[in-house]
Amino acid sequence: MAQMEVSYSRRLDYQYMMIETDEEARSDYRLSMLINNRINGFLPVHVQQMNGKSTLSYEITSLENLPEFLDARKITYDEMVSLLLQFCSAVSEVGRYLLDGEGILLEPQYIYVSKSLERIRFCYYPYQHMPLHQSVNVL
């Protein structure tokens, strides 16, 4: 996986998780798919390039990452089932856009949920090259 540096930013009423990578955003179909489509279950993303590096900005407005959410309260069995179903749906959804599961960041700090847990959003990072089954083990 490419070296990545994560930071957070607030602009007006929006919040972003920004991942700076040493990969230059080249004409990569995966990146184009992410930028030009709203993929259900995934954080919207914008890309900025400067000095041979790329910054992917993921909108996280009104969401909190999974560890923060779980620190604040426990989830029920039904909520856990809902999270797992949404994960399965997201994996299926990336296939519709010719993306593979390797780009889904499954580390808990990159998984975002709404305050009511009605929706879960994953981060798709096109420069990750870890098979999905290995990423699930990390989770």
PLM regions with names:
Residues 80, 104, 120:
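Conserved activation segment
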Residues 55-57, 112, 121:
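General beta-strand recognition
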Residues 2-84:
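Conserved structural core of kinase catalytic domains
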Residues 78-96:
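Conserved alphaE helix
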Residues 114-139:
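C-lobe/activation-segment region of protein kinase-like
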Residues 104, 109-111:
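Hydrophobic residue at the +6 position relative to the catalytic HRD Asp in the kinase catalytic loop
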Residues 48-49, 95-97:
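Short, charge-rich binding segments
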